């Protein structure tokens, strides 16, 4: 691995550590810190990402660009209560964010320059509200040492990235609004397609991979005609395109945008001009307030079925087979939702309110009400299937039920749809938990697989966890599977346990076990979400 930073010129060296992309409707980066796109100084706010303004000479790309606009705590607000469960006081590093944020970074191994290396493009998680491609957890050095180029990127978040409004729809030549964050991701993929060969990468062999919101976005892009031929494979860690709830059309989301303009004091006929002049943080604060009151149940930070970026809901696209025909590696962690439960408890405690302790019946009802709009009769079947366990074990069993209906069922459905489209799917479950005071309460929580995939155990984000040599051993295995898949579409390789491709009759999957071993198993999906192919397509078509 060469550890030099590149500037904006044709590279003379075959080894480049990091690279560019651009600014919120600009893109820069760290390979060369090259503006990939321009987007968010206010005249460009809520518009498609634009090519960067030209410049002469060498553009310094040795430092990372700003994160996109977000809460100053960033992903630290997610990590802090998890560390507290392990008895560690986690220090949140404030995030420096800006609307001038569309940058990408790349790690290129010290291989012959004309090698045509596979490319892995990472979409960070954070509920499409926080995070960036420059998080220490996503350092691509270890993955790139396996003979791949790793690219990470920023995209617009929250109200800057996912905001629909009638005036925006009217000014768009595509009569569309709401998917600016997705457009940034597509712009980054287009940059990779056009430029990565200059750095020894193969533009025809790109794997899009992500975690949580990044995983959801990656699978959503499978349903977008704008991403056609921009990637060949997808790795989806803990996030499914099917988890978006009722179809979110532009018409469904525009009333929230109008309410934001009204709350900002804008005149009805010129809300957009007012909103474009306000500080981004103020617009976000107004929207968050409305979500907490007038628009409860809305998720303002997810993709919109706009007729252009997304002609139909991702679930419908999967059901009809109108998706990008790519190979898929997908899975989830054994106790994804323990992290959100612990985070909610910490937030409630911090607010000064007494801890809410709903009765078991109320917990079950809350679970059913929260999941039924997303998954229809899967919810009722899950409640029936888990009722006895929930009565006996309480919250841990509810954690498991939530994990299955929001995680396992959608992953199995995606694998089935990809397989029916003639491609290969490989499914996993990550069960390894880190020994320590928080283990019993958290288990293999949401995002825990990230340091294993990137081999970033030592970075600040995860430094509070007492990892052992077993964890490092498992990381080496997972790195190999992930990069093998990126190279050929088959994760298997010498010395690795056989990971069988998905078959609907046996549902094979690989467990990254508590002991740190990779163990092949079968029958991935819970019994309540076993549907015939026709029934599954019907259920997805109704989402």
Where are these regions (language model features)?
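Non-catalytic accessory segments of hydrolases
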Residues: 2-179, 203, 365, 460-478, ...
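Bulky hydrophobic/aromatic "packing anchor" residues in well-ordered structure
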Residues: 36, 55, 275, 450-452, ...
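Short glycine-biased active-site loop of nucleotidyltransferases that positions the nucleotide triphosphate
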Residues: 142-143, 223-227, 439-444, 501-502
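Short, solvent-exposed turn/loop segments enriched in Gly/Ser/Thr/Pro and often Arg
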Residues: 156-159, 209-213, 429-434, 497-503
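Serine-hydrolase-like catalytic core of hydrolytic proteins
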Residues: 75-76, 83-273, 289, 308-344, ...
